[in-house]
Design a protein with these regions (language model features):
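Acetyl-CoA-dependent GNAT
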Residues: 2-83, 87, 100-102, 106, ...
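Short hydrophobic/aromatic beta-strand or adjacent loop that forms the aromatic wall/cage
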Residues: 49, 150-155
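Active-site acidic-Proline motif in GNAT/NAT acetyltransferases
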Residues: 87-89, 93
């Protein structure tokens, strides 16, 4: 992951600069982005999460998504999808959809057949609904957008076929 971290930082910073509500405020400095990915790296080493990455064919990572599998003992079947990030230069090329499709078999392989996620953007909500995710509900004024305005957050779930 050491080799990928600079590109992952670029994707995170770019996503925040383009308004993605992913837990960070704009402007996101490189040191904070690097600290985030180092934390993800530790979670990967501790088998608390799974990281997927996608390329557009040029060998450069265009997007990522994570599956949090660090659940409580009574939820060994559940995973939470986090941080679907696609660099702005790669948007509208199917990267997000490809990553979300890839999440499902990977989650199942990890024994996770009930997935949850949340999103603040209508574009992502349309993608999730098109892919069979079910609306759980909306919480108003849940978080701050990168520009510090309040935004609602929509929660989704999906039960996967256990093959």
């Amino acid at each position: 992951m050491e080799k990928l971290r600079p590109r992952l930082c670029e994707i995170l910073i770019d996503s925040v600069e383009h308004g993605a509500s992913v837990g960070f405020l704009s402007p996101l400095d490189p040191a904070s982005a690097d600290a985030f990915w180092r934390k993800v790296e530790r979670a990967l080493a501790d088998q608390q999460c799974i990281l997927l990455a996608a390329e557009l064919g040029d060998g450069v990572v265009a997007g990522t998504v994570q599956i949090d599998i660090d659940t409580m003992p009574n939820q060994p079947h559940r995973g939470e999808v986090h941080k679907l990030l696609v660099h702005s230069s790669a948007r509208r090329h199917g990267v997000g959809e490809a990553l979300m499709k890839a999440v499902e078999p990977v989650a199942l392989a990890a024994g996770r057949w009930l997935l949850t996620l949340d999103t603040a953007t209508a574009d992502a909500a349309r993608l999730y609904e098109r892919m069979g995710w079910k609306l759980a509900g909306v919480i108003p004024n849940y978080a701050l957008n990168p520009d510090r305005t309040l935004t609602d957050t929509t929660f989704y779930w999906k039960q996967l076929e256990k093959g």
